[in-house]
Each structure stands twice: as structure tokens, then as C-alpha cells.
A protein has these predicted regions:
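Fibrous stalk/shaft segments of extracellular and virion attachment machinery
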Residues: 68-75, 79, 86-137
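Autoprocessing Asn-cyclization modules and mimics
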Residues: 1-69, 74, 99
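Short, low-complexity, polar/charged sequence segments that are solvent-exposed and flexible
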Residues: 46-48, 84-88
Length: 137
């Protein structure tokens, strides 16, 4: 069974308030505006840089986040103060979604999942905010 992770369509980018070593299990960020209030959720540290690392946030107290390092196949590495941080969807989420689609083919009379949710009208009718698909664009 897939691990449930939480998301926010309104999470604002932030930065690392102090450096962390590759062995650190917590980090302090500048702000957590819009971050999910439930756990776990994924963040990219040093977003879009060669040293980018995915971490899984397991709990938080204010702007101090407790994290699992080197998440989803990335390597735990040190990060400097000011490193860009972004709330992200990870590859495993897409794999889990695809597996769910495969398992639910032919459920409720749906036989052609390739044609599902192909337009913004279809997506809105399904109750999925179109803005969700344009996050980070």
C-alpha cells in the first residue's frame, strides 16, 4: 500500500534559516506559509540546484521541521543558509497514482482511462482544482 503524503496548492517557497549537515534530522526554515498542516509531506532543499535533495517532513514545531533525509532516491547532503526550499510532488506520487489508475480500470463502468480528465473542463467536473495542475508552472 502506498504511503499517504499531504499537499498544499498554496505553499510558498522559503529558504533555509541555518545550514544543515548531511546527518541532520531537523531544519529551520524562514517560513511555513501554506505548508500542509498534516504529515508527512515532501520538500526539495536546494530546489533546482545540482545539490537538490528531497526530504520528508514528519513533524514540525513552528519553522523547525523534523525530516527524513535523502528521500525518494536522493542523497543526504549538507545545505547552506539561504538554500531554496519548495513543497513538491515526488516521482513516487506519480507512480502511486498510475498504479491506482491501473487497479481501478473497469471500475464503475470506466473502460478507457486514457480518455479520462483530458481537459480543464473534465478536471473541474471531477472536482479537481485546475490550479492543482499548474502548481509550480
Amino acid at each position: 500500500m502506498a504511503t499517504k503524503r499531504y499537499y498544499s496548492a498554496v505553499a510558498q517557497d522559503t529558504t533555509l534559516s541555518s545550514s544543515i549537515t548531511s546527518g541532520g534530522t531537523s531544519m529551520v526554515v524562514g517560513a511555513t506559509v501554506g505548508f500542509p498542516s498534516s504529515f508527512p509531506y515532501a520538500l526539495a532543499v536546494d530546489y533546482n540546484a545540482a545539490s537538490e535533495e528531497l526530504v520528508l517532513v514528519t513533524s514540525a514545531a513552528g519553522t523547525t521541521l523534523n525530516i527524513t533525509r535523502g528521500y525518494n532516491g536522493t542523497s543526504a547532503t549538507g545545505h547552506n543558509t539561504g538554500a531554496a526550499i519548495r513543497h513538491v510532488i515526488i516521482a513516487q506520487d506519480l507512480t502511486d497514482f498510475s498504479a491506482h489508475m491501473d487497479l481501478t480500470t473497469n471500475v464503475h463502468g470506466i473502460t478507457n482511462t486514457a480518455a479520462l480528465l483530458t481537459t480543464s473542463t473534465d478536471i473541474s467536473a471531477a472536482g479537481i482544482p485546475v490550479a492543482f495542475l499548474t502548481m509550480g508552472a
